[in-house]
Amino acid sequence: MVPSFVVYSSWVNGRQRYIRQAFASILFYIIRDTTLSFPSHTTMSTKPETDLQTVLDSEIKEWHFHIYFHQNNAAEHQAALELRDAVLRLRQDGAFVAVPLFRVNMDPMGPHPVGSYEIWVPSETFASVFSYLCMNRGRLSILVHPLTREELRDHEIRNAWIGPSFPLNLANLPIKSDEIPLQYPSLKLGYSSTAHKMSLEERRKLGDDIEAVLRGEKEAARAPHRDA
């Protein structure tokens, strides 16, 4: 049997890769440039980036989902462990690629104020994992944040929540690291992907095709004319 990560690697070529990553790309872009709630010491970001090459070069490829539970609440603890087991089973069945860390934190750890565990997700299967956790989290809260060299910003203003949010302890997070904190390079996904990358010309052609289709959709907003 072909390993599931090999199957996923074969999906990320050409148009299929473009479509499959669209959800993660849009969420990254929104979180990066139009964060809805800012800490008091931050200011609104500058004008959103529209240069195609710059946007592609800065695209986030890996994410963390942190599932929270009150460590003294037996029902929440059990629900969190059942969700973790379900993710592992579905990964084994090929539903998506998601890698829970071996450790479950039974006490506050790092920035996380309650019991928690981490799930690493590459951009190639972000939409599938996000969908599954939205539908199956029950009453658990889930912190979603990108993995970049700016760990503080990733947790502070680039984060998102599925369910009620928790206050994070950001005091010891580094402002900027020398390297991107990529994980599980053996899977060849996320930042470690070796899949074919579409050229700018291929992307613009695909974009033109999509615009042509959407001209028949009355509710779809029209894109402005492309700069020369």
Curated annotation (Swiss-Prot):
Pathway: Pigment biosynthesis; betalain biosynthesis. Homodimer. Expressed at high level in coloured cap tissue and at least 10 times lower level in the stipe. It is an enzyme of class 1 (oxidoreductase). It is found in: Cytoplasm. This is DOPA 4,5-dioxygenase. Gene3D superfamilies: DOPA-like domains. Extradiol dioxygenase that opens up the cyclic ring of DOPA between carbons 4 and 5 thus producing an unstable seco-DOPA that rearranges non-enzymatically to betalamic acid. Can also catalyze the formation of muscaflavin (a pigment found in the hygrocybe mushrooms family and of some amanita species only) by a 2,3-extradiol cleavage of DOPA. InterPro entries: DOPA-like_sf (IPR023389), DOPA_dioxygen (IPR014980). Coiled coil: none annotated. It comes from Amanita muscaria. The gene is DODA. Keywords: Cytoplasm, Dioxygenase, Oxidoreductase.
